[in-house]
């Protein structure tokens, strides 16, 4: 079976990771200590993508938990699913990275990274046929961003032909944790552009908006935000965990979603949105799900796709859904919103179906979009970066750990390049230099 090894780094990564494991354990019928008491063979069929079967009907996540300070991990260990994880797979330092990317990437993190790679290697050796890795982390801090990207490049070196997917929490303007977030995020994006195969961008601001606007929570906690993220992660990985036809592994997902190697940053969405306590008591239909899923308010990254165009997107429906109805809805969305899709990639919406819905819902859908409007997110971080870097504010924290200003300049220009690449494909039309094709295109459009 095609296994995936999961890594979670830093405080944010560990909290999201813990929520993810809690969600998928429930879906696969495992209790807090990994014992199976589910009802359906489908739960077991591809269990070993994410879980290792130990003795006594117990399943253990293929997860490696990493942090530069013990606090968050103690919390995970004390949580409801703390018994689930293999104790040897907790790798932590004592000093912390203090929100400093350089500490995570070059000094503190670099000391710990070999221990982590050893654990990862051991997990990989326990797999029949490893398909790749996924990592949860934030880009604004020290450990998840600095050490997380260091781990990604180390794993890349050792497993060059395996897929690398990241669930990356991007700093947002409204919900700022530290003042140096723009530095940490830009340095991280610089790494992700080169070393990751697919990055699912999650944005705290967008999550807050969803909690306040849609779920009507007056002051959402990180627990509420993580609940949303785990719903999306569960949806994105559905095709990997249950038998299905489309996007059944990380590589197929990437082949369908990434038209150019550097442009692998995805927006994600989920429908129906429910808050943690209250599951929706009304039935949802496929048209409603489709409508909600393509609604900008449902996107978990604070960029509005109406300001750009979709290169590709993928929709995953779960529950008892009719294939035909889904196809019709998708065609409908695409023909109504033609201007939001690039015309030079025909059939750029992929759909997948899985008959097992998430807990507490009859049906749900998850959306993954590769839209040029994600550049807004990088622009925003880039502008904040430039404002501080021009004055060399806070730089001494980084140079003190042995970093060079040159690296900042490179990261900045790499991110600017990324933004202009997105812009270039947003503006590209089918007719450039291909006049004879343009006429055919018009004919088809008139039918």
Swiss-Prot record:
Protein location: Cytoplasm, Cytoskeleton
Entry keyword set: Antibiotic resistance, Cytoplasm, Cytoskeleton, GTP-binding, Magnesium, Metal-binding, Microtubule, Nucleotide-binding
CDD domains per the UniProt record, alphabetical: beta_tubulin
Biological processes annotated in GO: microtubule cytoskeleton organization; microtubule depolymerization; microtubule-based process; mitotic cell cycle; mitotic sister chromatid segregation; mitotic spindle disassembly; nuclear migration along microtubule; response to antibiotic
PROSITE patterns on file: TUBULIN, TUBULIN_B_AUTOREG
Gene Ontology CC annotation, any one: spindle microtubule
Stated consequence of mutating residue 100 to I: Resistance to rhizoxin
Cross-referenced SMART domains: Tubulin (SM00864), Tubulin_C (SM00865)
Essential cofactor(s): Mg(2+)
Organism superkingdom: Eukaryota
Residues where Mg(2+) binds: 69
Gene Ontology molecular functions: GTP binding; GTPase activity; metal ion binding; structural constituent of cytoskeleton
Chain positions recorded as GTP binding sites: 11, 69, 138, 142-144, 204, 226
Misc. comment: E.nidulans has two beta-tubulin genes: benA and tubC; benA is expressed during vegetative growth. Rhizoxin, an antibiotic that exhibits potent anti-mitotic activity against most eukaryotic cells except for yeasts, binds to beta tubulin.
Role this protein plays: Tubulin is the major constituent of microtubules, a cylinder consisting of laterally associated linear protofilaments composed of alpha- and beta-tubulin heterodimers. Microtubules grow by the addition of GTP-tubulin dimers to the microtubule end, where a stabilizing cap forms. Below the cap, tubulin dimers are in GDP-bound state, owing to GTPase activity of alpha-tubulin.
Subunit-structure text: Dimer of alpha and beta chains. A typical microtubule is a hollow water-filled tube with an outer diameter of 25 nm and an inner diameter of 15 nM. Alpha-beta heterodimers associate head-to-tail to form protofilaments running lengthwise along the microtubule wall with the beta-tubulin subunit facing the microtubule plus end conferring a structural polarity. Microtubules usually have 13 protofilaments but different protofilament numbers can be found in some organisms and specialized cells.
Family per record: Belongs to the tubulin family.
Name the UniProt record assigns to this protein: Tubulin beta-1 chain
Gene behind the chain: benA
């Amino acid at each position: 079976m095609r296994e995936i090894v999961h890594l979670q780094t830093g405080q944010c990564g560990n909290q999201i990771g813990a929520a993810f494991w809690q969600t998928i354990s429930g879906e696969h019928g495992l209790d807090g200590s990994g014992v199976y008491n589910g009802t359906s063979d489908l739960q077991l069929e591809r269990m070993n993508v994410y879980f290792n079967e130990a003795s006594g009907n117990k399943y253990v996540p293929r997860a490696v938990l990493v942090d530069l300070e013990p606090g968050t991990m103690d919390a995970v260990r004390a949580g409801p699913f703390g018994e689930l994880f293999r104790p040897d797979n907790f790798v932590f330092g004592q000093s912390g990275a203090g929100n400093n990317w350089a500490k995570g990437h070059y000094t503190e993190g670099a000391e710990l990274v070999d221990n982590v790679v050893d654990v990862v290697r051991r997990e990989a050796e326990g797999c029949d046929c490893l398909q790749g890795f996924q990592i949860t982390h934030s880009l604004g801090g020290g450990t998840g961003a600095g050490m997380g990207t260091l781990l990604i490049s180390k794993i890349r070196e050792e497993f060059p032909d395996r897929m690398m997917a990241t669930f990356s929490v991007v700093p947002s303007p409204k919900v700022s944790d530290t003042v140096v977030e723009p530095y940490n995020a830009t340095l991280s994006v610089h790494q992700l552009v080169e070393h990751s195969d697919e990055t699912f961008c999650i944005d705290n601001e967008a999550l807050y908006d969803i909690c306040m606007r849609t779920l009507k929570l007056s002051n959402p906690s990180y627990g509420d935000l993580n609940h949303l993220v785990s719903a999306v992660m569960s949806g994105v990985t559905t095709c990997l965990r249950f038998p299905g036809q489309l996007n059944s592994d990380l590589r197929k997902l990437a082949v369908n979603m990434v038209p150019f190697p550097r442009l692998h940053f995805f927006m994600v969405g989920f429908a129906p949105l429910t808050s943690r306590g209250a599951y929706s008591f009304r039935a949802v239909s496929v048209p409603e799900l489709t409508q909600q899923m393509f609604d900008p308010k449902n996107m978990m990254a604070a960029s509005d796709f109406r300001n750009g165009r979709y290169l590709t997107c993928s929709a995953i429906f779960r529950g008892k859904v009719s294939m035909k109805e889904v196809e019709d809805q998708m065609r409908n969305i695409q023909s109504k919103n033609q201007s939001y899709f690039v015309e030079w990639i025909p059939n750029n919406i992929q759909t997948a179906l899985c008959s097992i819905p998430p807990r507490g819902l009859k049906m749900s859908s998850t959306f993954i979009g590769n839209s040029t409007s994600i550049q807004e997110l990088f622009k925003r971080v880039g502008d904040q970066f430039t404002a501080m870097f021009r004055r060399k504010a806070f730089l001494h924290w980084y140079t003190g750990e042995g970093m060079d200003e040159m690296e900042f300049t490179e990261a900045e220009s790499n991110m600017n390049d990324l933004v202009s690449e997105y812009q270039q494909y947003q503006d590209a039309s089918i007719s450039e230099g291909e006049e004879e094709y343009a006429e055919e295109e018009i004919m088809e459009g008139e039918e």
